[in-house]
């Protein structure tokens, strides 16, 4: 099916190949008449991307996420990321602490926010889900003719996580008015229209599969993923 990545077997029947240097490789069937985009050029395209990742959540809603391997341990554990930053600041091994005091103050003022989602997970108020963990626009294939979202790709980082992580990382880049690496911060703003478009697409596909608490904390994910990448 065009909507699914199909892994090709090796001559030995394995799902991957290990070369002489220990590197792992795998191949998937080419999905014809599709293309990918680095950014969304319209709210409609952003809505379609939200629908694609929302469908990903819906289709895997009953999959036992705790059986998945954690490819990158503590990947979106924001409190752990904060602790790493605090420890690095104390060591100040490169002697550059004085150059980033304003940035550190910004993060420290938001320390309490870092643990909001992880605390809810630990209290069983948020369910552990199968998450993609790289929900950027370029990881969706679109039909060249119709413009419809066809397939979510780049599954190397699929592992246990929270729905808010995937939603939030999409918003971090998708609802921004500037590129991710923009150095002129006067150009970087949050677009509410883009946020609404993505959210409509995402909840249109995943809404019924999510709990009320999950839906309510999706915007928190957007805030935390932005803070985490800044950390």
Regions flagged by a language model, labelled:
Residues 1-83, 160-163, 174, 179-186, ...:
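Conserved ATP-binding subdomain of kinase catalytic cores across diverse folds
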Residues 31-49, 62-132, 137, 141-151, ...:
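ATP-dependent phospho-/nucleotidyl transfer catalytic cores
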Residues 80, 196, 200-231:
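Helix-rich C-terminal or lid/interface subdomains of diverse kinases
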Residues 20, 45, 127-132, 159, ...:
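Secondary-structure capping and boundary motifs in well-ordered enzyme cores
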Residues 57-60, 86, 111, 115, ...:
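A structural signal for well-ordered alpha-helices, especially hydrophobic packing surfaces
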Residues 138-179:
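Catalytic activation segment of kinase domains across protein kinase-like and atypical kinase folds
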């Amino acid at each position: 099916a065009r909507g699914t990545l199909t892994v090709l077997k090796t001559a030995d029947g394995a799902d991957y190949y290990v070369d002489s240097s220990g590197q792992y490789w795998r191949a998937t069937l080419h999905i014809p008449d599709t293309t990918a985009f680095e950014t969304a050029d319209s709210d409609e395209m952003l809505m379609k991307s939200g629908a694609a990742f929302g469908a990903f959540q819906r289709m895997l809603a009953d999959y036992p996420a705790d059986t998945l391997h954690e490819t990158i341990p503590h990947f979106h554990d924001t409190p752990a990321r904060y602790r790493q930053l605090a420890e690095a600041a104390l060591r100040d091994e490169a002697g550059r602490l004085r150059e980033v005091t304003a940035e550190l103050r910004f993060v420290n003022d938001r320390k309490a926010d870092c643990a909001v989602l992880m605390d809810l997970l630990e209290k069983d108020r948020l369910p552990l889900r199968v998450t993609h963990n790289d929900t950027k626009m370029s990881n969706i294939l679109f039909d060249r003719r119709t413009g419809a979202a066809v397939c979510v790709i780049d599954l190397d980082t699929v592992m246990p996580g929270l729905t808010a992580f995937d939603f939030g990382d999409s918003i971090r880049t998708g609802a921004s008015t500037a590129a991710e690496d923009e150095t002129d911060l006067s150009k970087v703003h949050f677009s509410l229209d883009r946020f609404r478009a993505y959210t409509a697409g995402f909840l249109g596909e995943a809404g019924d599969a999510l709990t009320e608490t999950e839906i309510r904390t999706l915007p928190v994910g957007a805030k935390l993923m932005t803070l985490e990448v800044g950390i």
